[in-house]
Amino acid sequence: MEKRMETLEQIKETLRETSKLVPDIVRAAVGLEHHYQTVELPHDDGCVKSFAAAFLRPQAQEQAHGDGEVQQAVRMESASCYVPDHDEDAHFVHDAAGVVGGYRRRVGVDAGAFSRGLMTSAFAQLVTAEPGTPVCPYTLLERAYEETLESGAQGGSTAVILSLADGNVLRWAYIGDSAFAVLRDGRVVVRSVQQQRYFNAPYYLGGRRGDEGMTVGMVGEMKVRRGDVVVAGTDGLFDNMSDAELEKVVQIGTALGFSPKNMADIIGGTAYEMSRCLLKDSPFAVEWRKQHENEEGHFYGGKVDDITVVVACIVSSDS
């Protein structure tokens, strides 16, 4: 088992190669084709849209998303992509779990210290556990939080932890707007609920009086099966990419046989382009206008932020 995180050079390479990580058929599927292109499109770019549409499942087509007829032992093949802005997110991917932490900025402190502390503690717990020990996401997060508090780290962090146990049970614990979605047959079947005091003020783990701590943490579980795709990330992902857009990217990636790393890079690269697009609305911008409809000023386009993406593809344990 090993810690798998991007190094600084890999992050820089991701930024340099962002446009190459996002195929034009993905851009066409999510409405970015007129804003970012890596190749010159034909006179009628409808052919690119048609090509993209060929990979997408019709909206009217409903897929059953129960536990499946045959329960099969599965495992996670995971990878990540991190595109920094303030460079205050932290994450890691482990054979037993995927863990993501997003900063909660405070004036005068290292905003990323708390999220990095959470990740360091959680990872240390995993690598020192006996092989085969089931991972309880809530307990892992709770212990990591306690150790981070004891370290004296300032600031705060949202977090999400996912693990696979009992052969085919996906378990999770999260707090704030670090989030996840489980996709089956290209559709979101389970989605975390955003936790916030009010708009753009998420719950978080922190060390000051009045911080929520673990009391508002959400937990749950579901049975997964081969072919499911789990996507976790910080708000930099989900503030810029809607669930419907995430479905399109995953559908195309699945049809093209993307590896988890390819999928994470494509999702991260697409979210990065969305965050910097002023002409295409993001989920954050839409919600901002709802919350400020009686005020002067407007917010359009994407929301620039650190973007962390973890993708876990559920595969047969025999593969």
UniProtKB/Swiss-Prot annotation:
Catalytic reaction annotation: O-phospho-L-seryl-[protein] + H2O = L-seryl-[protein] + phosphate; O-phospho-L-threonyl-[protein] + H2O = L-threonyl-[protein] + phosphate
Residues that, per the record, bind Mn(2+) 2: D235, D305
Cofactor binding note from Swiss-Prot or TrEMBL: Binds 2 magnesium ions per subunit.
Keywords carried by this UniProt record: Hydrolase, Magnesium, Manganese, Metal-binding, Protein phosphatase
Domain PPM-type phosphatase: 73-314
Annotated positions binding Mn(2+) 1: G102
SMART domains, A to Z: PP2Cc
Family, as annotated: Belongs to the PP2C family.
Protein name per the record: Putative protein phosphatase 2C 23
Source organism: Oryza sativa subsp. japonica (Rice)
